[in-house]
Amino acid sequence: MVMKKLEEIADVFSGVQVSRFVDPKGEKTPIIKNKFTDSYSLDYYYENISNRINEKYYSKKGDIIISLSQPNTVSIIHEDGFIIPMYFAVIRVNEMYDPSFIYHLISSKDFHKKLHIFCEGGALRVIKVAALKSIKLNIPNLEKQKQYGEFFNLIDKKNMLIDLKKDYNDKIKEYLIQTQIKGE
C-alpha cells in the first residue's frame, strides 16, 4: 500500500455555476441537486443549458462527487451527461485506480474525520477544493482495489435490499392495520 494525495490519483475540481449557462434556447439538461432523494440515489432537475459549457462539467460514469458543505455527502455517478454544479467537488479518478474503491474510501468515517479538519466557516462549514486535493489516502495495488471495490458494492446492494424489504414490511403492516380499523 502507498500513501497518495487525492490530487495524485484523480482530477479534483469544483462544479460549474449553472446560472451562467442557463439559456432559454439551450438544450434541456439534467442538473444534479444538492439534495439526495435517499442514501442510494441523486436527485436532479432539468434546465435549458447553453452549449458553451465546458465538457468537464458533465458527469462521466465513475465520477465521484462530494458536497462542499457539510455533511459532505459523497456519491458515485452511474451515468454520463449530468451537469455538476459548483457546490460539489468532482473527483475524476485516473485510469490506474478503481473509482468504486476510491468512492468507498472517500465515503468512510476516517476520510470524513480528515475532511472535518479542513472545514472552514462558522454556521456553514465548507471544504475548499485545494484542501480536498491534499488529503492522503492509503492505496493498495489496482487488483486489490478492484476486489475491495466489488466487495464493498455487494455490501451496499445487500444493505439497499434490506432497507427496501423493511420499507415493504412497514407498508404491509400499515395496510393490515388500516384494514382492521375499517373492519374489513
Model-identified regions with their sequence ranges:
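Non-catalytic DNA-recognition/assembly elements of restriction-modification systems
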Residues: M1-K28, T37, N138-E184
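Sequence-specific dsDNA recognition surfaces
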Residues: K5-R20, N34-K61
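A short glycine-rich beta-alpha junction/loop motif
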Residues: F82-M86, G121-K146
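Glycine- and charge-enriched low-complexity intrinsically disordered segments
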Residues: S100-G122
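Short, surface-exposed loop/turn microsegments at beta-strand edges and helix-strand junctions
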Residues: V22-T29, K56-S59, I76-Y87
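A short beta-sheet element
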Residues: S67-I106
